[in-house]
């Protein structure tokens, strides 16, 4: 099926999917052996795109591939293969609310747990001690009580984030599917935020959950990284070979 497809599209999350979580987000890197596999798949003619919560430019610096498309900040940013970056419009009131929320988190002594991205403020507690996690969870709940209508609060694996409505991983996948209607598409992700992407896949698309433990999901397939992830990518290569 893959070999006969006129176009193939492999869409990938990064953190927790292709790269293990680390105490410092800036230290995250691909599992060993993943980069050459992706490069080989790309050389075979599969189009590769990334959909991530990270800023698009940050992810571009971590991926040793050329000519890939990146949706960053959960779809708020789009980095074209040519390097052109576009961002969704944000209302001034939304930006001000996010700025105030980020300041509140930092002022509470949790600047180390704060991640500010375009259209998003995230609180990370995966590597916090129990007492610190309790405090961060309480702070997230307090901030969430004052959510404006155009901002949503969302839990993810290891934290909580406040994100301007309108764009998410699902809208990114829907955009790709609309521009490549004949492509056989697979989406690989690990987190709750990836469920939007699984839902947005076309009927012929394959959703792949990549994580150590199974959870309720809309994905069609479950892989435990890194070994089963390697096997899946190698199988993709084999299926495409003439």
Question: What spans do the regions from the language model cover?
Answer:
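Residue-level signal for inorganic ion chemistry
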Residues: 16, 70, 123, 173, ...
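Substrate-recognition "cap/lid" segment bordering the active-site pocket of phosphatases
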Residues: 73, 79-96, 154-182
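Mg2+-dependent phosphoryl-transfer enzymes with acidic/Ser/Thr/Gly-rich catalytic loops
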Residues: 5, 31, 165, 170-242
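Active-site phosphate-binding/coordination module
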Residues: 29-117
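Charged, glycine-interspersed solvent-exposed loop segments at helix/strand-loop junctions
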Residues: 113-129, 151-163
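Substrate-recognition/cap helix-loop segment adjacent to the acidic, metal-dependent catalytic center
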Residues: 54-73, 131-151
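Non-catalytic pre-domain segments flanking phosphatase-related domains
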Residues: 1-14, 18-22, 26, 33, ...
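The start of beta-strands in P-loop NTPase/AAA+ ATPase cores
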Residues: 8-10, 68, 185
């Amino acid at each position: 099926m893959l070999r006969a497809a006129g176009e193939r599209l492999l869409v990938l999350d990064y953190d927790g999917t292709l790269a293990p979580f680390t105490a410092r987000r800036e230290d995250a890197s691909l599992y060993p052996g993943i980069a050459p596999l992706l490069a080989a798949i790309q050389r075979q003619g599969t189009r590769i795109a990334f959909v991530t919560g990270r800023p698009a430019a940050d992810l571009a610096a971590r991926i040793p591939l050329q000519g890939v498309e990146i949706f960053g900040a959960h779809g708020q940013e789009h980095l074209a293969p040519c390097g052109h970056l576009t961002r969704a419009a944000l209302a001034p009131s939304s930006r001000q609310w996010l700025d105030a929320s980020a300041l509140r988190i930092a002022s509470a002594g949790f600047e180390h747990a704060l991640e500010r991205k375009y259209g998003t403020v995230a609180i990370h507690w995966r590597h916090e001690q129990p007492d610190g996690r309790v405090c961060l969870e309480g702070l997230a709940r307090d901030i969430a009580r004052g959510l404006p209508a155009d901002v949503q609060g969302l839990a993810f694996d290891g934290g909580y984030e406040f994100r301007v409505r309108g764009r998410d991983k699902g809208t990114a996948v829907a955009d790709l599917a609309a521009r490549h209607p004949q492509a056989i598409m697979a989406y690989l992700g690990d987190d709750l935020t990836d469920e939007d992407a699984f839902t947005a896949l076309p009927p012929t698309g394959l959703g792949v959950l990549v994580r150590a433990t199974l959870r309720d999901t809309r994905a069609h397939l479950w892989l435990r990284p890194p070994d089963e992830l390697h096997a899946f990518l190698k199988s993709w290569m084999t299926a495409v070979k003439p």
